[in-house]
Amino acid sequence: ILRRVHDALEAVDMLDYAKSAPHMLSGGQKQRIAIAGMLAIEPQVLVLDEATAMLDPLGRKDILRIVKDLNRKKGITVIMITQYMEEAVIADRVIVMNEGLVAFEGTPAEVFRRGTELRKINLDVPPMVELRDDLAASGIIKPCNAMTVEEMANELCPLLLKI
């Protein structure tokens, strides 16, 4: 079991804090320790409910990186419940719930094409999706599926090089 705990702490970059008092850790560090606790039991599926709530942007980014790594490198299925639509961008599949029912589902690209419907149920689209849609509506870029800063940069850089 010590080996599994060691490996779990290493997976979430918290090995250096193994002997730290919990009250001395930041919110993001506590979340990573909680995830490590789940990893130590070697689950096939990990369910995270608002895992990034009340974290600063850097803490949120760290948790999302860890979640992505768990899925891609360790093959763990991660079910992530979140109210932050920009977090859903990293998912393979998104299920949008409204009043306890499935409103719609699909890939992030499919779901975020439905910005008007998302807003009707009081959900936002990720900022890059909103920027993308505004730029496309203004004719500045062609309609595309860019959802992250990197993807948007890939769309905009060729245009800037033409100027």
Model-identified regions with their sequence ranges:
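Catalytic Walker B motif of ABC-type/P-loop ATPase nucleotide-binding domains
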Residues: L46-D49
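Conserved ABC ATPase signature
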Residues: A21-L25, Q29
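Conserved catalytic motifs of ABC-family nucleotide-binding domains
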Residues: E42
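Hydrophobic anchor residue at the start of the ABC signature
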Residues: I35
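Conserved ABC ATPase "signature" region
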Residues: L2-Y17
